């Protein structure tokens, strides 16, 4: 049964959504909120390319994510470095796992966070089933991924690779000030005027 009130509500929501998207495009702002997925990576990479095509002005990328699919995070990380405009990453809420990988794609001086942001670094994890030989292949791949991520975080923070490996052996939580001291964050900001 069709409900005309529901149809009318959807019609009124659509322009607001388009208007909000247009305003975000004009402000050159992208939001990564939630789990990192292939779908989110496609959306964010498309937005980065579209904003880069529109102008060379700086882009602001807000990150609030529990992490997710590492390869999708890699895609966004690499695209941030690939586009011509400067990309500022601004952490808010929590920046964890693959979300932290995306966050550190910007040069240190372009990595900011809000005061209550929490960061989580840790080893990649995964589950596999199947034949022993396939499980062995997956184990080797996750070890390679862990070593690669340790190198990325070492380069981004200035911390030695062995320290990153030790710290991320288990969940490694940092508040905003701790993340700044660790080299993840350059500045803690409280207003958009500070960006």
Curated annotation (Swiss-Prot):
Transmembrane segments: none annotated. InterPro entries: ClpP (IPR001907), ClpP/crotonase-like_dom_sf (IPR029045), ClpP/TepA (IPR023562), ClpP_His_AS (IPR033135). It comes from the Bacteria. It catalyses: Hydrolysis of proteins to small peptides in the presence of ATP and magnesium. alpha-casein is the usual test substrate. In the absence of ATP, only oligopeptides shorter than five residues are hydrolyzed (such as succinyl-Leu-Tyr-|-NHMec, and Leu-Tyr-Leu-|-Tyr-Trp, in which cleavage of the -Tyr-|-Leu- and -Tyr-|-Trp bonds also occurs). The keyword Ribonucleoprotein does not apply. Belongs to the peptidase S14 family. Cleaves peptides in various proteins in a process that requires ATP hydrolysis. Has a chymotrypsin-like activity. Plays a major role in the degradation of misfolded proteins. Fourteen ClpP subunits assemble into 2 heptameric rings which stack back to back to give a disk-like structure with a central cavity, resembling the structure of eukaryotic proteasomes. This is ATP-dependent Clp protease proteolytic subunit 3. It comes from Rhizobium meliloti (strain 1021). The lineage of its organism: Bacteria, Pseudomonadati, Pseudomonadota, Alphaproteobacteria, Hyphomicrobiales.
């Amino acid at each position: 049964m069709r409900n005309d009130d529901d149809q009318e509500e959807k019609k009124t929501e659509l322009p607001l959504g388009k208007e909000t998207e247009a305003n975000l495009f004009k402000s050159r702002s992208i939001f990564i909120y939630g789990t990192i997925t292939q779908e989110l990576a496609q959306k964010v990479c498309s937005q980065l390319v579209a904003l880069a095509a529109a102008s060379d002005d700086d882009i602001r990328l807000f990150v609030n994510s529990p992490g997710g699919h590492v390869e999708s995070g890699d895609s966004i990380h690499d695209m941030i470095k690939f586009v011509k405009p400067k990309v500022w990453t601004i952490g808010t809420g929590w920046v964890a796992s693959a979300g932290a990988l995306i966050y550190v794609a910007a040069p240190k001086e372009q990595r900011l966070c809000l005061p209550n942001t929490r960061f989580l670094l840790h080893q990649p994890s995964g589950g596999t089933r199947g034949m022993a030989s396939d499980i062995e292949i997956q184990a080797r791949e996750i070890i390679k991924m862990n070593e690669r991520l340790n190198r990325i975080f070492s380069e981004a923070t200035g911390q030695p690779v062995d320290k990153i490996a030790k710290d991320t052996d288990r969940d490694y939580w940092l508040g905003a000030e701790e993340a700044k001291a660790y080299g993840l964050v350059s500045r803690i900001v409280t207003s958009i005027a500070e960006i």
